[in-house]
């Protein structure tokens, strides 16, 4: 039947797209860029799906960074700095003092926290600060 044919075609297209996305994910950055350019794409479809999903669900990502690890945390739109701190640990929210915040692009451009601080890109935010997508945050707290 026509429905069965359409259903089969959708499955095949989906399976092919999934395989292509997997292959793209296995490429090094230069090969990935060349492949995406060849396909006239600016980024993998999976990135777009994740981004749109976050928008639809009202979610944002902020980062914490230490000497050996950078970690992404998911929060809801409208979270204040103490709310975001609470995602890491309830003590962080309860004892929140302030947040040291760097915009993600500034963090990358300045080579991390130290360079951002030296170039005046680190700012102190209080309890009312609404966390922005991509903020790199170091929470100060006391419990």
Residue ranges of model-derived segments:
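Single conserved hydrophobic/aromatic residue that forms the stacking wall/gate
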Residues: 1-12
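C-terminal-of-GTPase-core extension/linker across diverse P-loop GTPases
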Residues: 14-132, 137, 142
């Amino acid at each position: 039947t026509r429905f069965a044919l359409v259903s089969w075609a959708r499955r095949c297209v989906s399976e092919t797209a999934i395989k292509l996305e997997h292959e793209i994910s296995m490429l090094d950055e230069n090969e990935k860029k060349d492949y995406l350019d060849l396909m006239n794409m600016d980024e993998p479809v999976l990135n777009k799906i994740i981004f749109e999903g976050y928008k639809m669900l009202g979610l944002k990502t902020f980062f914490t960074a230490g000497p050996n690890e950078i970690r992404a945390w998911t929060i809801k739109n409208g979270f204040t700095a103490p709310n975001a701190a609470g995602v890491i640990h309830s003590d962080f929210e309860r004892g929140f003092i302030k947040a040291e915040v760097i915009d993600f692009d500034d963090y990358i451009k300045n080579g991390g926290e130290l360079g951002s601080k030296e170039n005046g890109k680190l700012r102190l935010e209080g309890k009312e600060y609404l966390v922005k997508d991509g903020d790199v945050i170091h929470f100060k707290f006391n419990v």
